[in-house]
UniProtKB/Swiss-Prot annotation:
It catalyses: a plastoquinone + NADH + (n+1) H(+)(in) = a plastoquinol + NAD(+) + n H(+)(out); a plastoquinone + NADPH + (n+1) H(+)(in) = a plastoquinol + NADP(+) + n H(+)(out). It is a peripheral membrane protein. It comes from the Eukaryota. It is found in: Plastid, Chloroplast thylakoid membrane. It comes from Chloranthus spicatus (Chulantree). NDH is composed of at least 16 different subunits, 5 of which are encoded in the nucleus. Binds 2 [4Fe-4S] clusters per subunit. The lineage of its organism: Eukaryota, Viridiplantae, Streptophyta, Embryophyta, Tracheophyta. This is NAD(P)H-quinone oxidoreductase subunit I, chloroplastic. PROSITE patterns: 4FE4S_FER_1, 4FE4S_FER_2.
Length: 180
């Protein structure tokens, strides 16, 4: 008779333990119900990039002096700078400037070391294409400014968790306002 009683006691203890585990997991689920969703609906919602985000490189042709510092500091010697020496004025004349973003590692060295600040990083990160040759940007394509995510009224902008903490500490500015 005692084995039957101990069997019922073990069964009762296991039932209570299982109910406790189910209750704990249910409480965890309920605690996550109040949180904002982590995923975003990508084509219609986009995250606002941080100020130090390293996206596509923007090139200003008028400022470039063809010094080739960008080529020397690039870890993979990526920028292609073609120039010709103008003998009458003793200056280099830039003929072609191109960067292949299929190979670029977006380290930002070219932007940091450029003496004339003709290179800058943009917030554009949508560089996907079906043909890798379309990722080779010349000076004309590099000179185009991308459309800002904040200025696009068709897209709802979402703040990152670090940006939400900054917003609670600082007053709102144009980079922290979401479009509704």
């Amino acid at each position: 008779m005692f084995p039957m009683v101990t069997g019922f006691m073990n069964y009762g203890q296991q039932t209570v333990r299982a109910a406790r585990y189910i209750g704990q997991s249910f409480m965890i689920t309920l605690s996550h119900a109040n949180r904002l969703p982590v995923t975003i609906q990508y084509p219609y919602e986009k995250s606002i990039t941080s100020e130090r985000f390293r996206g596509r490189i923007h090139f200003e042709l008028d400022k470039c002096i063809a010094c080739e510092v960008c080529v020397r500091v690039c870890p993979i010697d990526l920028p292609v700078v073609d120039w010709r020496l103008e003998t009458d004025i003793r200056k280099k004349r830039l003929l072609n400037y191109s960067i292949d973003f299929g190979i670029c590692i977006f380290c930002g060295n070219c932007v940091e070391y450029c003496p004339t600040n003709c290179l800058s990083m943009t917030e554009e990160y949508e560089l996907s294409t079906y043909d890798r040759h379309e990722l080779n940007y010349n000076q004309i394509a590099l000179g185009r400014l991308p459309m800002s995510v904040i200025e696009d009224y068709t897209i709802q902008t979402i703040l990152n968790s670090t940006q939400i903490q900054i917003v609670t500490d600082k007053p709102l500015n144009s980079r922290t306002i979401t479009n509704s």
